[in-house]
Amino acid sequence: MTAVESGSKVLRMKESDAQKLLAMRCHIGTRNQSSAMKKYIYGRTAEGSHIIDVHMLWEKLILAARVIAAVENPKDVCVCSSRLYGTRAIYKFSQHVGTSFHGGRFIPGTFTNQIQKKFMQPRVLVVTDPRTDHQAIREASLVNIPVIALCDTDAPLDFVDIAIPCNNRGIKSIGMMYWLLAREVLRLRGTIVRSVPWEEKVDLFFYRDPNEAAEEKAAAAAAAPAAEVEEGFGWVERNDDNAWEA
């Protein structure tokens, strides 16, 4: 029995949450396995892919949510994703939870070089993949920043404080994990209640809303200065017929 199952009934995994995890294949890992992730593996599929223990996944998810919710200022939590599939998920996560985020290539010195323009001093770091986000994890270890990571079955756990075992290679799996993490943080803060389903759709964590894209395009067009169009080459025509009549 896990710590969450033996503790409060409120934090236990519901059947609907388990169905969401299975539908998005959050429990399907890779064919490789690291020694550090061995304790999170339940079995293997017929194709050879490792199966992650869903109960341990949920236990670590709740632990990570409690750590994030305990930070007084949400901006002190930085969410990073060098993996392209995770940029949309961390954007929506930061939008709902209020954290800072860093998508795309992590610029070296973001946590260690104080003269850098985008220098940050977060209290907690959340990464999508310990392999692709290795630079952020290494810099966090130099300045004593706790690290929460979504870890697949072959992930290295060096300098990772809280490893959430899950499938971090699929866009839908990443979106579901950040959706569940955001929902749990908001519940712990008291922003939303547990008795009412969260209105935010998980699809928006990996697909872009067409209405949102249209609104951003219209706002960008309104903010851009109108280009001045001049006809001809800009010369000034004048009539010199009476120039010698003076």
From Swiss-Prot:
Keyword Kinase: no
RNA-binding found in the keyword field: no
Subunit and partners: Component of the small ribosomal subunit. Mature ribosomes consist of a small (40S) and a large (60S) subunit. The 40S subunit contains about 33 different proteins and 1 molecule of RNA (18S). The 60S subunit contains about 49 different proteins and 3 molecules of RNA (25S, 5.8S and 5S). Interacts with ribosomal protein S21.
GO molecular function list: structural constituent of ribosome
Localization per Swiss-Prot or TrEMBL: Cytoplasm
Stated role: Required for the assembly and/or stability of the 40S ribosomal subunit. Required for the processing of the 20S rRNA-precursor to mature 18S rRNA in a late step of the maturation of 40S ribosomal subunits.
Protein name: Small ribosomal subunit protein uS2
Family: Belongs to the universal ribosomal protein uS2 family.
GO CC terms: cytosolic small ribosomal subunit
Top-level taxon of the source organism: Eukaryota
Biological processes, Gene Ontology terms: ribosomal small subunit assembly; translation
InterPro entries membership: Ribosomal_uS2, Ribosomal_uS2_CS, Ribosomal_uS2_euk, Ribosomal_uS2_euk/arc, Ribosomal_uS2_flav_dom_sf
Endpoints of the signal sequence: none
